């Protein structure tokens, strides 16, 4: 980072690694190093990051050294779905991290997904309620996307085994790149139709930005 600043005049650094920070001690040491050099730049965590090691002290240190943007990826507001997709995160920790981040005036985005293969309507409504709660807490942006099975994931293998995914070609990968298309429909949920999922997504986005 210091090399990029001195040689190229870099003013902002984006950390695209989803697991950039896994230990509190590393976060604090990184922030101290920025202050000791000293380096003047802003930095972001725009791709989603783990929150287990982040507390008020960590987020205060991050903000004081130029961290302006924090993206969290709880994925679902349903504990049942979090267990199904093996997402080892507690929603209570997400809410706590948001509170601390907003106290530091950070821009906070949260990513959510609906339409997992075994998801039920009750799970979707829990996710929509979580999105609305994010809005009330001051979260600046939300990504509410329909589930897309990525090759190599357990859910992708499951869908191949059940015959839901048959052909992998250029159009399949193109579909993975249009997550923000509100008209996009999911074809992988066993309990909810694509049209109904698209409706839920629209309701969620309107509710978040409407409040």
For each feature predicted by the language model, list its residue ranges:
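Catalytic palm subdomain of template-directed nucleic-acid polymerases
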Residues: 119
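Conserved SAM/AdoMet-binding glycine-rich loop
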Residues: 1-109, 114-116, 141
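C-terminal accessory regions of radical SAM enzymes
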Residues: 122-211
